[in-house]
Amino acid sequence: MSSSKTYCIFSANYLPNVGGVEKYTQNLAFALADGGDRAIIVTSNVFDLPAWETLRNGVEIVRLPCWKILGGRLPISRRNAEYRALYSRLAGKRIDYVVVNTRFYRHSFEGVRLAEMKGIRPIVIDHGSAHLTLGSKILDVAVAQYEHAVTRSLKRHDADYYAVSGASCRWLEHFGIVSRGVLNNSIDAEAFRRSSSGRDFRSELGLGDDRFVVSFAGRFIPEKGIVPLMDAAEQLSGESDVVFLLAGDGPLKREVEGRGLPNVVMLGRLDAPDIVALLQSSDAFCLPSRSEGFSTSLLECAACGLPPIVTHVGGVDELMLDESYGCLLSEATAEEIVKWVRVLEDDPERCRAIGEKLRGYVEEEFSWPRTASKVREACAAANSSRTSD
């Protein structure tokens, strides 16, 4: 008799939307499938893709119809005829465990509802370390109130809570939730490097080896720290040897473009293979985020042996054991960023040593098979405790 299990993973957003939760969901599902289990991803159909899709590795993707609130950042299911048909088909599947990624989306309740229908105690994995921000004090207050309201409602349901980092565990305490442990973000470092498109961004942009290249990859939104990063670039604009390469898109794109800084190159939204090539063409990676659960970008830069310049957000405690693993910003300010850029630029040997040490640590400690095993244990424990209550 087969011991394989079926894991149903709920994530409000999924690829091609770019984000850490989306990548976490994909990699977890693939790792479970590679280990002999079945995985079904249930998400929102933000991009009008096929409603039900089976990938070559057997992973199924179910895309529920949705209202695309905030440009798709906050999708809410449309419970129309298509939704009812999809959910009925999903409910008819043999499902052993339910995993819900993040607690503050209405989509999370879709997972909890299915779990209750199946008599399953779900696990909820938190990916944050601070409230969401839209860059407006008034809107941010409303978003925080919304997050608290959704979380209070979710807490009424039976579930075990986990987080992707120690910082996320501590953030759950803000909502009166005690995390049962860490199910950390991970990366297949070797496969990530192999996936590179091979583009030579230095050559394409006419940047010689004497130029110190600092890269950024992520959404152009306030919480990613794009504004202080541009302030730092402006302070360094008179120094011709430092150049910032920015990959991504978002609401603050026009503000960044409007600066017209000579040492900033906007590359637009890059495909994953080009992101790898960008990191491999860089000297350092900067992510002055306000909030991260466990930054996927930080793992990716580590996989490429690139020294990070990063704020003390989720994942930093796990990855950067001390200053020999990276450069920790005391706060997300231009002055702090400039300080660390200059430190690395002036000491190439230190720059290289940090990257090599971080890369070795990530390869040894942060693999997806290991995280998938932890998820299996968490799901089994959740349902074992339920039957013994």
What does each model-identified segment do?
Residues R113, M117, A130, A142-Y161, ...:
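Membrane-proximal helix-turn-helix segments that form the acceptor-binding/catalytic region
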Residues Y162, G208-K224, M230-E234:
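Conserved donor-binding/catalytic core segment of Leloir-type glycosyltransferases
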Residues A167, S186:
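Carbohydrate-associated surface elements
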Residues R254-P273:
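Nucleotide-activated donor-binding/catalytic signature segment of Leloir-type glycosyltransferases, i.e.
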Residues R269-L270, A277-S282:
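Short alpha-helical donor nucleotide-sugar binding micro-motif in glycosyltransferases
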Residues R290:
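Aromatic "clamp/platform" in nucleotide-sugar-dependent glycosyltransferases that forms part
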Residues P307-V310:
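Short hydrophobic beta-strand element within catalytic cores of glycosyltransferases
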Residues D322-E323, C327-A334, V343-P348:
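Conserved acidic donor-binding segment of nucleotide-sugar-dependent glycosyltransferases
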